[in-house]
Amino acid sequence: MAEKPGLRLQSIFDEGHFIHEKWQRWFQEMGTLYGKWYCLDCDEYFWGGADCHDGPLEYCEVPLFYEPLRIYGHADGWLVNLGDPLMLEIKSIGIGTIRYEANELIGIHNGDMEKIWADIKAPFMKHIQQVQIYMKLAELLGFENAPQEAVIIYENKATQDAKEFVVPKSDFSIAEKFEAAAMIIEAVNNNEAPPCNIRLGGCSKCGGYSE
């Protein structure tokens, strides 16, 4: 059984969940939230907007599983009725996020989170790749009117200030990942080890696959 997180770590998780749920609730009240819903009364799932079913609905976000490549994603939301459809990703930003995604900002601003926050002018690369993968999965799954743009919302954990960034769909930063997934699936189907990605002809770590 997995060990339960400590109080501090659990508090961090809960705060992140609260921020996500808050933004999703706001978009639901605006009539712009689309995706998968669960009806608490009839115990059934529905796809659509918040008006897709009469009854108390719980938002299940946007699960995206492309079986041929075994790639699964789970977007925070899909926005409609605001112009073109938008894939939604919500991120709570604290000093831990900065340390992981843009550690250089801590040194530049001597750990001053207010100054660091002001210096965030664009979404972090990993978050861009994340929404690009979600948009690609929606395309591969054949969703009608699949989003061609994503909106990434950052909320400062300390002050609740928010920033939003719109990211146009592009396969440039993720094409290699999808190609690698296809290569691995082919190798598994052929009962072969995939080619070594460290050295042509294999490296020391490849030995176990040939025994």
Model feature map: region roles:
Residues 1-87, 93-112:
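Metal-dependent nuclease catalytic cores that hydrolyze phosphodiester bonds in DNA/RNA
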Residues 42, 100-102, 109-110, 118-128, ...:
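Metal-dependent nuclease catalytic regions and adjoining charged, substrate-binding loops involved
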Residues 85, 90-92, 154-160:
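A short mid-domain helix/strand-loop element embedded in enzyme catalytic domains
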